[in-house]
Amino acid sequence: VTKWDWEACMTVPENQWGYHKDWSLSYVKTPIEVIDRIVHAVSMGGNMVVNFGPQPDGDFRSEEKELAMALGCWMKRYGECIYGCDYAGWDKQDWGYYTRKGQEVYMVVFNRPYSGLLKVKVPKGTEIERAVLPDGQVVKVTETARNEYNVAMPSQDPGEPFIIKLQVKEASGATDGYRDALT
């Protein structure tokens, strides 16, 4: 994370910029991998450029078209966690990434824990007021310790990375209901 603007660029097949006739020489990224890299870049305050190499006739390979369609479908459902978002300033968790737009922090979940609970550590003085899915369904949030919460996952597995939008409140010099241990 840096205060300067930055951008990452990636190719769909590894190390093949522009058009290459033979894709068998390298690994071709899946839609989930490309989404992960885009979200990762935004979560660190950056931008991601995905390279598609047009064929000599100007058309794209069917694989690239399918990838673009998958990315477009995901962005249509969850693009609010990307467009206009930036670094959230929260510690990354094993389940995915955070992005932020104003007082809304987006949890972008790639890995569903078996417990069905997403552990969230918030910066000091930050409270989670509400958690909702993109369809407006409210998600249960339980404070478990100082600056730590459990956020329940939706019962239905969407089968793809999904988002939970957190509405947060930040207070300067706030005190909480916890007391430090006396030693």
Feature locations, PLM:
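Mature catalytic domains of secreted/periplasmic carbohydrate-active enzymes
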Residues: 1-183
